[in-house]
Amino acid sequence: FFNYGVGTNEDSNISSTVLIDLKGNELSLYKYKGTQFIDNIEEVATTFTELKEVMYNRYKEMQINGDKLYKGKPIYVVIDEVGTIGTYHDKKIRDAIFNDMIELFQKGRACKIIFLIFAQKCDSTNIPSNVLTNIQSRILMKTDSEFNTNSMIGTKEQIQNITHIDVANFNKGRAITKDGITSETSLIQVPYVSENEHRNIVRHLGHSLKN
């Protein structure tokens, strides 16, 4: 809400937001100005193609101005349960999306196309390994999966250098972050908001951002 200001393009700190939820039940709450909600995979493929074109245009602008980092507003792409893409039956569409994701991950950050992806399990079962390796910064929340812990942050011994609390016993809002550039890890505590309170915030503050 803060980044969107009062809902006008001039007041917002964000160019636009793309919310992808192929299960279609959670991110559909946020149908605001400058926000595109997607719940079908064909539209995901189309949107990623369009985002690549935006990325190329931003790079051209950066080259003309001699900038290493795009000076305009960022575009955020939020994908809930990214592994759902890997279960889609059409291999051609599925592979095209993952290939576009790799290119956008590799090149998009400098021109402020930022991806935030969420998954219950981070392995190559539903997400190709070459996609996973191009995810730079990572966040590990409460989990009893040793595989998730290893793939996101590191071994149990490495975790113990960060915190003495077992990841499986983390409080709500507790997480370990890993910086994609420096590989530095940090233990953080995010304020926890209950589902009911969250829905109240969406209802009371979201009216000024509605389309």
State where each predicted segment sits.
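C-terminal alpha-helical "lid" subdomain
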Residues: 168-211
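C-terminal boundary and immediately downstream tail of ABC-type ATPase nucleotide-binding domains
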Residues: 163-167
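P-loop NTPase catalytic phosphate-binding loop
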Residues: 1-63, 71, 75-76, 83-147, ...
